Every structure is written in C-alpha cells, then in structure tokens.
C-alpha cells in the first residue's frame, strides 16, 4: 500500500512540476504593448525602402519569414499567416506601408501586415 501511494504521488507530482516549469506561449510585451524588436525589425521603414530600391532587401525577406514562423507557432488556430500571399506580395504591402510611415520601425510595418493577413490565414493543414 505504501509503495503504491508513493508511486501515485510520483505520477501526479512529476507531471505537475513539468507543467509549472513549461514555457507557455503568450504575447511578450509590457502593459503598453512595447517590446524590443531585434535585427532588421528595429530599422526605420525608410531604411527598408532604401534597401529595397537598391535590390538589397534579402535580409528583410529573411527577417519577415522568421517573424512569420514565430507568429505561425504562437498564434492560436494558425498554420500559415500568409494565407495565399507570397513573399513578394508581402514585401509590396510592407513597402506601401513604409511609404506612408517612413519613421515607423520595420517591425511595426510587419505588425500591420499581420493584422491585414489574419482574416485570410490558413487555420488547418491541408489534407
């Protein structure tokens, strides 16, 4: 009986500890929605536009795809935030945003893109 009780406690306690210390995906920002954007996300939109006009937007493409991968992983009921929009379409949308808001950060432009893409996102893997 005593051995069974210990096993039962161990079977309940270990998963409980794992659950407590397991990272839980949530939106990471402060109460005002501020967060630190790293890499090209911290650049001004006007810097992106200049790079794009010179054919040097490849690092921004990579940054956007990495950001979208994280969004896909952390957004409930989302498999692919892009929906049917390809990377060139996304970069065109980002350029249009940045023309209107040249002093905004590139990450802020990408956030606006995500909001626009959200209704058209893929919510389940195709069968």
Language-model features and meaning:
Residues 10-23:
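Bacterial N-terminal signal peptides
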Residues 24-30:
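Sec/Tat signal peptide C-region and signal peptidase I cleavage site
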Residues 102-127:
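C-terminal partner/receptor-binding element of secreted or periplasmic proteins
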Residues 2, 18, 25, 83, ...:
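Family-specific functional hotspots in central-to-late sequence segments
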Residues 1-7:
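N-terminal secretory signal peptides that target proteins for export/translocation
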Residues 33-96:
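Short N-proximal segments of mature Sec-exported proteins
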